């Protein structure tokens, strides 16, 4: 199983946002992690722009978006941005896409949120050839009429993963993409709902085994601090729970809130919980570090402890190198001074 790290800016700390994002990407690259995942938050950095920054600062690690909503962007516009980012990343970009949520697309953006799976299928009809390499894109379907040349990079096809939670999107992800990106999915939801549907669809389409990237909050702490870590996780990450999409996914598992997904405690407890996701069928873990503490110094120390342990786990989990240019990772001792105080929840 591959271990990746969610990175992203803290809200409100404007002067150092870019430097901190770069530092986080460098740390993950040098520490040997498989992937850095950049979230798309409605009021924050654009994920593909941030991914380009991360790619320019690194040489080995996979850089992924988690996830870019399709509704605000024409598929050719997204393809241009993704291919431009791929050129910066040197072939290390994986494009995570999603249909977002009704309360974002309709209520915040004023765009229609209808037939999301059908919309994504029509979108991929355009995006697939656009990401496949230089040349014309000629597609006409129920939503798009496109006759557009693209000649941005000759880097091979850009991997695409879908934020697929329900049966229709899982079917589409297995048929047409490289896998799925998950949030709010516990072990039972992954093992009994996600993996079987996704795998069957991929097999029927003659595609290779799909990736299953599970987003998991993690806090390395003492046993007597676990309750505080759970409370903090619920406080800073509970916003997603209001989405019907995530509620339906929670209903398919044993978790009832995001704190139930937290891998917390000592090294053995954290490793055991992460391995339980691998046993359920996750191919990747995208770690959202949740630091705890009463002040900024304690938060920084907590974040560093958890990250250092993640670097150690990459070896014991035998995470393969991400598809990237060759390069030996440096010592994981290099650490960013940034700390996520919880503002940048997904």
Short names for language-model regions:
Residues 1-346:
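Active-site-adjacent structural elements that line small-molecule/cofactor binding pockets in enzymes
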